[in-house]
């Protein structure tokens, strides 16, 4: 088995971030947008953990806890907003959720 290097983790982090970014850019479903944002947060967390692991410092791990705290708050608020929008409009498509129309 080939040992994983810092570059391996950073490439994986970049690929995950790119997949999440593409999901945010090209999808019109709010749940998919939300999942893309979460994937981008996980990718940045992986980068911090990789730098922390290979540099021998614990500073990256502190940022991971902050990122996970923000992600947990984002999940709670984001899903509550999506559920409220679905109950009111019966859709989760971004194109149909114009609050300025009617």
From Swiss-Prot:
UniProt keywords, alphabetically: Cell inner membrane, Cell membrane, Membrane, NAD, Quinone, Translocase, Transmembrane, Transmembrane helix, Transport, Ubiquinone
Annotated Pfam families: Oxidored_q2
One GO process term, biological-process aspect: ATP synthesis coupled electron transport
Places the protein is found: Cell inner membrane
Annotated Gene3D superfamilies: 1.10.287.3510
Known EC number: 7.1.1.-
Membrane topology according to the record: Multi-pass membrane protein
NCBIfam families linked: PRK05715.1-2 (NF004320), PRK05715.1-3 (NF004321), PRK05715.1-5 (NF004323)
Identification of the protein by name: NADH-quinone oxidoreductase subunit K
Organism for this UniProt entry: Opitutus terrae (strain DSM 11246 / JCM 15787 / PB90-1)
